[in-house]
Protein backbone atom coordinates (compact mmCIF):
# COMPACT_ATOMS: atom_id res chain seq x y z
CA UNK A 1 0.00 0.00 0.00
CA UNK A 2 0.86 3.69 0.03
CA UNK A 3 3.64 4.94 2.26
CA UNK A 4 5.40 1.58 2.41
CA UNK A 5 8.94 1.06 1.24
CA UNK A 6 10.60 -1.82 -0.52
CA UNK A 7 13.83 -2.76 -2.23
CA UNK A 8 14.46 -3.11 -5.94
CA UNK A 9 17.58 -4.87 -7.18
CA UNK A 10 18.84 -3.79 -10.60
CA UNK A 11 21.60 -5.87 -12.20
CA UNK A 12 23.87 -4.43 -14.88
CA UNK A 13 25.55 -6.69 -17.44
CA UNK A 14 28.66 -4.66 -18.33
CA UNK A 15 29.38 -6.98 -21.29
CA UNK A 16 26.34 -5.46 -23.01
CA UNK A 17 27.28 -1.80 -22.50
CA UNK A 18 27.98 -0.17 -25.88
CA UNK A 19 31.28 1.53 -24.93
CA UNK A 20 33.58 2.75 -22.18
CA UNK A 21 32.49 5.81 -20.25
CA UNK A 22 29.08 7.02 -19.18
CA UNK A 23 25.91 5.16 -20.10
CA UNK A 24 22.54 6.39 -18.84
CA UNK A 25 19.15 4.74 -19.01
CA UNK A 26 15.82 4.75 -17.23
CA UNK A 27 14.02 1.85 -15.58
CA UNK A 28 10.25 2.25 -15.26
CA UNK A 29 8.18 0.55 -12.59
CA UNK A 30 4.68 -0.68 -13.23
CA UNK A 31 2.27 -2.53 -10.99
CA UNK A 32 -0.26 -3.44 -13.64
CA UNK A 33 -0.21 -4.28 -17.34
CA UNK A 34 -0.79 -1.06 -19.28
CA UNK A 35 0.59 1.30 -16.59
CA UNK A 36 1.75 4.57 -18.17
CA UNK A 37 5.45 5.47 -18.27
CA UNK A 38 6.20 8.80 -16.60
CA UNK A 39 8.38 10.72 -14.16
CA UNK A 40 6.50 9.28 -11.16
CA UNK A 41 7.60 5.72 -11.93
CA UNK A 42 11.02 6.43 -13.49
CA UNK A 43 14.31 5.37 -11.90
CA UNK A 44 17.26 7.01 -13.72
CA UNK A 45 20.29 4.70 -13.82
CA UNK A 46 23.82 5.59 -14.86
CA UNK A 47 27.09 3.68 -14.95
CA UNK A 48 30.66 4.57 -15.91
CA UNK A 49 32.43 1.62 -17.55
CA UNK A 50 36.20 1.64 -17.04
CA UNK A 51 38.88 -0.31 -18.92
CA UNK A 52 39.82 -3.74 -17.54
CA UNK A 53 43.50 -3.78 -16.53
CA UNK A 54 43.50 -7.34 -15.15
CA UNK A 55 44.95 -8.80 -18.36
CA UNK A 56 47.92 -6.46 -18.85
CA UNK A 57 51.39 -7.97 -19.01
CA UNK A 58 54.14 -7.51 -16.42
CA UNK A 59 55.99 -5.31 -18.95
CA UNK A 60 52.91 -3.07 -19.34
CA UNK A 61 52.40 -3.01 -15.57
CA UNK A 62 55.99 -1.82 -14.99
CA UNK A 63 55.92 0.79 -17.80
CA UNK A 64 52.44 2.29 -17.72
CA UNK A 65 51.30 5.49 -19.38
CA UNK A 66 50.65 8.30 -16.89
CA UNK A 67 48.37 11.24 -17.57
CA UNK A 68 49.01 14.75 -16.25
CA UNK A 69 46.56 17.61 -16.74
CA UNK A 70 47.35 21.31 -16.39
CA UNK A 71 43.98 21.65 -14.58
CA UNK A 72 41.18 19.37 -13.36
CA UNK A 73 38.82 22.22 -12.51
CA UNK A 74 38.05 25.29 -14.62
CA UNK A 75 36.63 28.58 -13.34
CA UNK A 76 34.59 30.23 -16.12
CA UNK A 77 32.37 32.50 -14.00
CA UNK A 78 29.00 33.74 -15.29
CA UNK A 79 27.85 33.66 -18.90
CA UNK A 80 25.05 35.52 -20.68
CA UNK A 81 22.70 33.25 -22.65
CA UNK A 82 24.23 34.44 -25.97
CA UNK A 83 27.81 34.05 -24.71
CA UNK A 84 30.30 31.21 -24.89
CA UNK A 85 33.67 30.85 -23.21
CA UNK A 86 36.50 28.40 -23.86
CA UNK A 87 39.49 27.20 -21.84
CA UNK A 88 42.32 24.93 -22.92
CA UNK A 89 43.84 22.21 -20.76
CA UNK A 90 47.21 20.68 -21.61
CA UNK A 91 47.27 16.89 -21.34
CA UNK A 92 50.72 15.33 -21.04
CA UNK A 93 51.88 11.72 -20.96
CA UNK A 94 54.47 11.56 -18.17
CA UNK A 95 54.55 7.75 -18.31
CA UNK A 96 56.64 5.15 -20.11
CA UNK A 97 54.25 3.89 -22.82
CA UNK A 98 51.61 5.35 -25.15
CA UNK A 99 48.70 7.09 -23.42
CA UNK A 100 45.32 6.57 -25.06
CA UNK A 101 42.37 8.83 -24.41
CA UNK A 102 39.76 6.19 -25.15
CA UNK A 103 36.65 8.26 -24.55
CA UNK A 104 35.73 11.86 -23.89
CA UNK A 105 32.18 12.77 -22.87
CA UNK A 106 30.30 15.78 -21.59
CA UNK A 107 27.58 15.24 -19.01
CA UNK A 108 25.25 17.80 -20.61
CA UNK A 109 24.74 20.12 -23.59
CA UNK A 110 26.22 23.19 -21.86
CA UNK A 111 29.75 21.97 -22.67
CA UNK A 112 31.59 21.09 -25.85
CA UNK A 113 35.03 19.48 -26.16
CA UNK A 114 37.73 19.34 -28.82
CA UNK A 115 40.79 17.13 -28.47
CA UNK A 116 43.79 17.46 -30.81
CA UNK A 117 45.29 13.96 -30.33
CA UNK A 118 43.92 10.79 -28.71
CA UNK A 119 47.23 8.87 -28.51
CA UNK A 120 50.27 10.45 -26.84
CA UNK A 121 53.75 8.96 -26.90
CA UNK A 122 55.78 9.23 -23.65
CA UNK A 123 56.67 12.90 -23.08
CA UNK A 124 54.15 14.16 -25.64
CA UNK A 125 51.29 16.53 -24.92
CA UNK A 126 48.09 17.73 -26.56
CA UNK A 127 45.40 20.35 -26.05
CA UNK A 128 41.86 19.75 -24.82
CA UNK A 129 39.57 22.71 -25.51
CA UNK A 130 36.46 22.92 -23.33
CA UNK A 131 33.74 25.38 -24.34
CA UNK A 132 30.79 26.43 -22.18
CA UNK A 133 27.63 27.57 -24.00
CA UNK A 134 25.52 30.16 -22.16
CA UNK A 135 22.25 29.29 -23.90
CA UNK A 136 22.31 25.71 -22.54
CA UNK A 137 23.39 26.56 -18.98
CA UNK A 138 19.89 27.26 -17.64
CA UNK A 139 18.99 23.56 -18.06
CA UNK A 140 22.04 22.34 -16.12
CA UNK A 141 21.64 20.93 -12.62
CA UNK A 142 24.88 20.88 -10.62
CA UNK A 143 28.38 21.47 -11.94
CA UNK A 144 29.01 20.78 -15.65
CA UNK A 145 31.67 18.09 -16.05
CA UNK A 146 33.79 16.39 -18.68
CA UNK A 147 34.54 12.66 -18.37
CA UNK A 148 37.76 11.23 -19.80
CA UNK A 149 38.52 7.49 -19.98
CA UNK A 150 42.20 6.59 -20.43
CA UNK A 151 44.48 3.56 -20.48
CA UNK A 152 46.44 4.94 -17.50
CA UNK A 153 45.89 2.16 -14.91
CA UNK A 154 46.23 4.69 -12.06
CA UNK A 155 43.82 7.21 -13.65
CA UNK A 156 41.39 5.36 -15.92
CA UNK A 157 38.63 7.89 -15.14
CA UNK A 158 39.20 11.62 -14.93
CA UNK A 159 36.44 14.12 -14.28
CA UNK A 160 37.07 17.77 -15.10
CA UNK A 161 34.72 20.13 -13.28
CA UNK A 162 33.73 23.33 -15.06
CA UNK A 163 32.56 26.03 -12.64
CA UNK A 164 30.23 28.16 -14.76
CA UNK A 165 26.78 29.62 -14.20
CA UNK A 166 24.26 31.53 -16.30
CA UNK A 167 23.55 35.19 -15.55
CA UNK A 168 19.97 35.57 -14.43
Where in this protein do the model-derived segments appear?
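Beta-strand-rich interaction surfaces with strong enrichment in secreted/lumenal proteins
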Residues: 1, 14-15, 75-77, 115-120, ...
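Surface-exposed binding patches on compact interaction domains or structured appendages
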Residues: 1-9, 96-125
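Short, hydrophobic beta-strand segments
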Residues: 8-16, 128-136
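Beta-strand-rich extracellular modules
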Residues: 13, 30-34, 133, 149-153
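Short glycine/proline/serine/threonine-rich loop/turn segments at secondary-structure transition edges
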Residues: 15-25, 136-143
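Long, low-complexity ectodomains and other extracytoplasmic segments of secretory-pathway proteins
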Residues: 32-90, 94-95, 153-168
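Ser/Thr/Gly/Pro-rich, low-complexity flexible regions
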Residues: 105, 115-118, 129-132, 157, ...
